[in-house]
Amino acid sequence: MSNYSIKQSAKNNYSSSSSGGFRGGHGGNEYFCGVGGEGDFGGMGGFGACGAGYGGGAGYGGGAGGAGYGGGAGGGGAGYGGGFGGGSGAGYGGGFGGGAGGGYGGGFGGGFGGGAGGMDIFSTNEKQTMQNLNDRLASYLDKVHALETANTELERKIKEWYEKQRPGSSSGDGAKDYSKYYTMINDLKNQIIAASIENAKFLLQNDNARLAADDFKMKFENEQYMRQTVEADINGLRRVMDDLTLSKSDLESQLESLSEELAYLKKNHEDELKGMQVTQVGQVNVEMNAAPSSDLTKILNDMRSQYEDLAKRNRAAAEEQFNRMSTDLKNTLSQGIEQQKESKSELTELKRTLQSLEIELQSQLAMKKSLEMTLAEVEGSFCMKLSRLQEMIVNVEEQIARLKGESECQTAEYQQLLDIKTRLENEIETYRRLLDGDLSKPKSGGGTSTNTGSTSSKGSTRTVKRREIIEEVVDGKVVSTKVVDM
């Protein structure tokens, strides 16, 4: 059976030689290599050793200067095949085998076609197609290798960057350690917070002092108003007292006039009594025997007693009237004073209530103003925070959109690379079929067989082996492959 192992050398690449082919042979990257034994598919060479094709020379397999598809140990040819067992092939279309000329068999002791002509089954277009496929495969592998190298480099740079950004890291490129600044930053933050708290305390004390000053000012104004009110009340009481003094003076003058009148009446009465007594003493007693007359003394005494009683009654009535009027006036004055005191106390209480209500109103207004200022500050801070959050949301959305775009691009690139990989796998499968000897186009659903031969000659000894490759193709796809040695 054919032995065509696919290897990769220690260099892990497929670099082209100076002649145009892939480097192989005795130590290069051997794509189809291995030391071919008797009847094997290949020889010592790989993907090219000294020519410009896939094999040695200009062929696909090639040996140490050979030119065949599998390559043997022949001389330097130039064909695509060059001989299954070696020889000196003669051109791309010169045969799949070797020998002295072209031909399909070549190495079976003259080749399948006798070694002098053979069947030209490959054309120049097929050679160019294979060369193009070879170039595309090499380009793809180079691109994959370059991408892997770039990816490794990017991973290394990302890792180094994360190592640099990690706190306390000390990389070889002189990364700085900022951990010592964190304590300073925290101390400064604490100082800023303490200063802010102290500033807030000072502002609060200032507001309290201003409110206290306003309260004292209001109290002073209220006390001043109360003082003016009390002074006005005192002036009113003074006027009332003056009126009462005038009334008292009038009453005293009336009392004096009444007393003088009483004294005058008494004096007149006494004078009349004295005059009557003198008249009675100096009269002449004339006695007549007549009817008894009334006693004048008794009459005068009766009159005097009547006048005295009348004077007493008048004096008592005047005193009673004076006392009653004085009592009424005193009661009225006392009631007025009591009402005035009650009114003053009620007014004072109302003023105190008004003052307390005004103070409470001022405090509530100040509290309302401070709360409004606090609310405005809180609304401003929250508006700023909301704007920052909205900016962060917009940035995150932009990053998400950018990442989505990058992901879509990477997905498209991945799909493209996957398609390229699929096409390359199909091309490699085509290469394998070509290596297996499937040189003719099989019919759909049927199996075909191709006879290949290999020959190796040493002196006069010739060994010939035949094998049959059977492939089952369904809808243009190879379903199964079978190799039968003849």
From Swiss-Prot:
Q: Which GO terms describe its biological process?
A: epithelial cell differentiation; intermediate filament organization
Q: Which GO terms describe its cellular component?
A: cytoskeleton; intermediate filament
The record's SUPFAM superfamilies line, in alphabetical order, gives:
Intermediate filament protein, coiled coil region
Key words, A-Z: Coiled coil, Intermediate filament, Keratin
Q: What are the boundaries of the region Disordered? A: 435-466
Q: In which residue ranges is the amino acid composition biased (Low complexity)?
A: 449-461
Give positions of region: Coil 2.
300-438
Q: Where is this region: Coil 1B?
A: 185-276
SMART domains per UniProt: Filament
Region described as Head: 1-125
**Where's the IF rod domain?**
126-442
Residues at site: Stutter? 380
Question: What ranges does the record give for the region Linker 1, renumbered to this chain?
Answer: 162-184
Coiled-coil stretches are none
| GO MF term set | structural molecule activity
Top-rank taxon = Eukaryota
Is the keyword Coiled coil assigned to this protein?
A: yes
- Pfam families linked to this entry: Filament
Q: Where is this region: Linker 12?
A: 277-299
List other remarks. There are two types of cytoskeletal and microfibrillar keratin: I (acidic; 40-55 kDa) and II (neutral to basic; 56-70 kDa).
Q: How does it assemble?
A: Heterotetramer of two type I and two type II keratins.
- Which family does this protein fall into? Belongs to the intermediate filament family.
This protein is called Keratin-3, type I cytoskeletal 51 kDa
Q: Which organism is it from?
A: Xenopus laevis (African clawed frog)
